[in-house]
């Protein structure tokens, strides 16, 4: 099996983490995240809670990554999008 490169990213409002890792073909999203070292660096990442994706598309930890993929670790939502839309709609109705 040959080696491939995969980027693993995790973004916070104040800082972004980007790690490039070398993996064997057939490696999974979870293996890429573990190899990146981000789990040791950021203890707030919980793979049972945080969703993950590849190039902005939802992925599972067991999905196989391809050479050049960008694995993304997403932060949990802090607000309900439906509730925010409802509040904006109410505010726009009350404006003259």
Curated annotation (Swiss-Prot):
Stored Gene3D superfamilies: RnfH-like
Highest taxon above the source species: Bacteria
Alphabetical list of InterPro entries matching this protein: Mopterin_synth/thiamin_S_b, RnfH, RnfH_sf
One Pfam family linked to the record: Ub-RnfH
Sequence similarity: Belongs to the UPF0125 (RnfH) family.
Record protein name field: Protein RnfH
Gene coding for it: rnfH
């Amino acid at each position: 099996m040959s080696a491939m490169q995969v980027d693993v990213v995790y973004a916070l409002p104040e800082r972004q983490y980007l790690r490039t890792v070398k993996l064997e073909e057939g490696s999974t999203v979870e293996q890429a995240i573990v190899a990146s070292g981000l789990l040791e660096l950021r203890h707030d990442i919980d793979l049972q809670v945080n969703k993950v994706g590849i190039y902005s598309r939802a992925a599972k930890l067991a999905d196989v990554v391809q050479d050049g993929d960008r694995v993304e670790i997403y932060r949990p939502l802090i607000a309900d999008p439906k509730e925010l839309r409802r509040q904006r709609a109410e505010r726009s109705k009350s404006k003259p």
